[in-house]
Regions:
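An acidic, low-aromatic, low-complexity terminal/linker signal
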Residues: 1-193
Length: 193
């Protein structure tokens, strides 16, 4: 049986009174990286936790007509339209079977707003020293999306650069879909007086 998945929000990861935010500045290159490790299409990958707003179980998605195949749908997250991207289709991996443990990783700062990645499951949150990350050559990854590799135990993990998951034209198209979905959400919402 898969491990239990906990819903985590960015605010629960950073406290304003945290001692890490005080004291002398430390070069980011010596700090360890905290990564959200996930499985998708038979592959294991990770993104920096600083790009993750929340990790949540699969939810009901709107599927407006005309969505590209790489979009599973639009998530209504507290009144905000969040496009849900299928990495298995984008990276041409084995087709992902959606199930009880399918998970959404909601990220900020990747497109012009939020975007969610639909993955098989998030398996763990790990801390990795920068010295344990092997770089991936610029020409070994489409759009330099895979920016490094590391191992945890015997498991090889591909590190993804969230800002490079989509090409600029794909981000523009995604932003247009997001704006359209946001307008539709507003049209159907009931104004509270």
């Amino acid at each position: 049986m898969p491990d239990k998945v906990t819903v985590t929000t960015r605010s629960s990861l950073q406290r304003p009174d945290s001692p890490l935010q005080k004291g002398p500045e430390i070069s980011p290159s010596v700090l360890p990286q905290v990564l959200a490790v996930f499985e998708v299409g038979g592959q294991v990958a990770a993104i920096p936790i600083q790009n993750v707003e929340r990790i949540t179980p699969m939810a009901r998605l709107a599927r407006p007509p005309g969505l590209p195949a790489v979009l599973e749908g639009i998530l209504n997250l507290a009144g905000t339209a969040v496009p849900v991207l299928r990495l298995d289709r984008l990276f041409q991996l084995g087709e992902q079977r959606l199930g009880l443990y399918s998970t959404l990783i909601v990220m900020q700062g990747v497109a012009d707003g939020r975007i969610a990645l639909l993955v098989d499951r998030v398996s763990q949150i790990v801390t990795v020293a920068h010295s344990e990350v092997l770089p991936v050559g610029k020409h070994n990854s489409f759009n330099e999306c895979a920016c490094g590799m590391t191992t945890v135990g015997e498991q090889v993990i591909h590190l993804l650069a969230p800002a490079r998951i989509l090409l600029a034209t794909e981000r523009k198209t995604l932003s247009e879909f997001q704006e359209m979905a946001q307008r539709r959400l507003k049209e159907w919402s009931i104004e509270k007086e």
